[in-house]
Amino acid sequence: VTAENIDDVVDGLAGIVREAGRAGDRVGYFAALYRQVTVEVRTAIHGGLFDDGARMDRFDTLFGNRYFDAYDAWRRDRSGPRCWREAFGLLDEADTIIVQHLILGVNAHINLDLAIAAARTSPGEAIHGLRRDFLLINDILGRVVLTVQDSVGALSPFLSLLDRVGARNDERILDFSVRQSREEAWYNAVLLAGQNEKEREATIQRLDIRAAVLARLIARPAGLVRPALQLIRSTESDDVPAVIAHLDNAMERPSVRQGTG
């Protein structure tokens, strides 16, 4: 898949979600989350919420193609960025819970791809003019992530355990990972935008290694989190197509956030 515009990104993600649903492939979990983020960004572009809608279409297309390239490389010969290999490599591991699959995708896409896409959209000094729209895209991402995580609760009855043993100050674990990462992503975007090709390659490699290390911590956490994950996994739905369909419709359920603290 190579997207030319944001509509192509939405269509490409919808295709992956459809295919994953048919095949019972957990790659559809993050793809469903990401499809909804992209639909919300497109709605914001059409609604004139960004300073420069055409620029954000370009940004989102570059961002989406980073995911499609990683997905295609993994499917082809298990290659691609390290952090995406970590995420895709856990798709067949029965012990990984739904929310881990989501966080692994969010980790790779924010900690590696977001900064690269931003720097390519607005290279050099132009990067500073992107900041407001960059933060707005992150707000949209955070909102969709929270809604999807709330919807995971219906499939994963003991998910709230993670907040108690793993996340600081009772913050939802996915929300924390998004907000923690976005300021770093902006810093790295500014860094990349001002670098030459050789410097940029070295920075991208460093970001990939760091995101891959984070992915390993997400996949195999220590301490109290591990037994909590085993308990959560034992009560989660095993019906992968049903989970994908549920996640893919999270934004269409207005009541999903009610009753969540």
Tell what function each PLM region has.
Residues 1-12:
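Acidic, low-complexity proline/glycine-rich segments
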Residues 20-68:
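N-terminal interaction modules that seed assembly of large macromolecular complexes
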Residues 48-150:
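Internal, hydrophobic cores of structured domains that mediate oligomerization or house catalytic pockets
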Residues 120-187, 192:
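Long, charge-rich C-terminal accessory regions
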Residues 174-261:
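A cross-kingdom marker for long, charged
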Residues 13-24, 90-94:
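Short, charged, low-complexity loops and linkers
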